[in-house]
A protein has these predicted regions:
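A glycine/proline-hinged amphipathic helix-loop "lid/cap" segment
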Residues: 1-75, 227-232, 317-319
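Alpha/beta-hydrolase superfamily serine-hydrolase fold, recognizing
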Residues: 24, 58-319
């Protein structure tokens, strides 16, 4: 049984999604002013949302990418969480996720860095991947952290970016981070999984209405950041479910049972099992896509505690 706070959250986000979907257009249709409006509106939610007590923010630059550093008195300055925000690669920013990462930093006892990576449709792939790699290397080369002090992760499209950044770092032969924590990751941009259907779209209060509009117009959400002529579904640096996760660090996955992207996480879990990659997997009953965005729910607080416990196990013990 989900909490009363979660029940109220679902009601609120149904209204939010209805409002957003009434303005939403598919990647091939959307205009610059609509994109600008969505970005402003979503950023506003993170700015006005609650923050953990004593939250400190600082604007820094990692590998040439503007980044928001977030910490609280509980944050360990030697334990770093490089967190890529979600938003379908078309919206979202450190501002939109400020409330979320404030509580995440506080409860997981980490110092969180949120890159303001380039978005589509203005910036197409591989701009996002380049920024993901640059920010990780910036923590090492510019700030002096060791890879063992760094965890990476993110929600939705940010989870995708964490995965493809990991696979790119592996190809480059760079020392990998200590672990990954993925929140409702968009691991399958092709939308080919079992949960991509009308029933799940009706159950997913956050992105279901948007995806039904995309399907209706025979479009693909990934067109926000990849041009059709550049799509290669066998390229693991675009579509990470085609990748190999042997010799990768431990990976944690959290996903809601009521989200359209449920099969993304389920398939990723099977791949990690296939490749012998240490992992922890949690399905949150009754929860919607990136439920963590609502920090008023006890489910969110417990999810952040799960993340903190997972990261703790894989950071150096003396840091």
């Amino acid at each position: 049984m989900i909490s009363k706070e979660a029940q109220e959250s679902i009601k609120r986000y149904k209204q939010f999604a209805s409002f957003i979907s009434s303005f939403y257009r598919t990647p091939s249709e959307i205009s610059a002013w609509r994109i600008s409006f969505f970005r402003w509106f979503i950023n506003l939610q993170g700015v006005i949302g609650p923050k953990a007590k004593g939250t400190i923010k600082e604007e820094v630059t990692l590998g040439g990418v503007k980044t928001l550093k977030v910490s609280t008195p509980n944050s360990d300055p030697e334990r770093i969480f490089l967190y890529y925000h979600g938003g379908g690669y078309a919206m979202g920013s450190p501002k939109s996720h400020y409330s979320l990462v404030s509580y995440l930093a506080d409860i997981s006892k980490t110092t969180v860095y949120v890159p303001d990576y380039r978005l589509g449709p203005e910036n197409k792939y591989p701009a996002q991947l380049d920024d993901g790699v640059s920010t990780y290397l910036g923590l090492i080369n510019d700030f002096g952290y060791s890879p063992s002090q760094i965890a990476i992760g993110g929600d939705s499209a940010g989870g995708n970016l964490a995965l493809i950044t990991l696979l790119k770092l592996k190809k480059l032969g760079v020392e990998l981070p200590s672990s990954l924590a993925l929140l409702s990751p968009w691991a399958d941009p092709s939308g080919s999984g079992e949960s991509y259907n009308d029933e799940m779209a009706d159950r997913d209060i956050l992105i279901g209405p948007i995806m039904k509009n995309v399907w209706k117009n025979n479009d693909e959400l990934y067109h926000f950041f990849i041009d059709e002529e550049d799509v290669d579904k066998q390229n693991e640096l675009m579509f990470p479910l085609s990748g190999n996760f042997q010799d990768c660090p431990p990976i944690m996955i959290q996903v809601g049972t009521e989200e359209l992207l449920l099969s993304d996480s389920q398939t990723l879990k099977k791949l990690l099992e296939r490749d012998g990659c240490e992992h922890e997997y949690f399905e949150w009953e009754g929860m919607y896509h990136v439920f963590h965005i609502d920090v008023s729910m006890p489910e969110t607080i417990e999810a952040f505690k799960q993340i903190g416990n997972f990261l703790e196990k894989h950071f150096p013990k003396n840091s």
